[in-house]
């Protein structure tokens, strides 16, 4: 996690969360973001850990508390690609997408992921640039 103070609040970067809601909650409790803070999340919110759905809920809630700038990670890109392509869905599942689906407690699969989660993923940017920093997900 990188942190910088800016004129209108703090600029904070948070790296790969990978479905670990408790870790994200601990970070957010420690930094206690406010409306003047900008948080850049660097992608890979989902897969591998047990709580991907909850992580997306936390990030959506966080966007109401501060300026949130979500960056697209390769795991989110795989999930988005899997919506319309069965081969992409198989690849995504083999890279941790099965854990993401399990976090929704749905047997029916990808069709039961809430629309607000898809909207959040679609809002993710490829990068964010400030006067001093360029933020991106480095796995490309």
PLM regions and their residue ranges:
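Short hydrophobic-aromatic micro-motifs
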Residues: 13, 128-129, 133-138
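Active-site neighborhood of divalent metal-dependent phosphoester bond hydrolases
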Residues: 48-130
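Histidine-centered divalent metal-coordination motifs
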Residues: 18, 74-75, 137
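N-terminal active-site segment of His-dependent metallophosphoesterases
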Residues: 1-56
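Beta-sheet entry/capping signal
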Residues: 10, 38, 67-69, 133
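Residue-level preference for short coil/turn positions at secondary-structure junctions
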Residues: 7-8, 35, 64, 129-131
């Amino acid at each position: 996690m990188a942190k910088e103070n800016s004129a209108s609040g703090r600029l904070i970067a948070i790296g790969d969360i990978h479905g670990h809601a408790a870790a994200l909650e601990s970070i957010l409790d420690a930094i206690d973001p406010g409306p003047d803070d900008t948080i850049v999340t660097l992608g890979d919110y989902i897969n591998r850990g047990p709580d991907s759905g909850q992580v997306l809920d936390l990030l959506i809630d966080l966007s109401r508390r501060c300026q949130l700038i979500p960056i697209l990670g390769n795991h989110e890109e795989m999930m988005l690609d899997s919506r319309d392509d069965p081969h992409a869905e198989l690849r995504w599942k083999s890279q941790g997408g099965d854990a993401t689906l399990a976090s929704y407690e749905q047997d029916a699969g990808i069709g039961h992921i809430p629309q607000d989660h898809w909207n959040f993923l679609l809002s993710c940017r490829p990068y964010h640039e400030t006067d001093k920093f360029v933020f991106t997900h480095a796995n490309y």
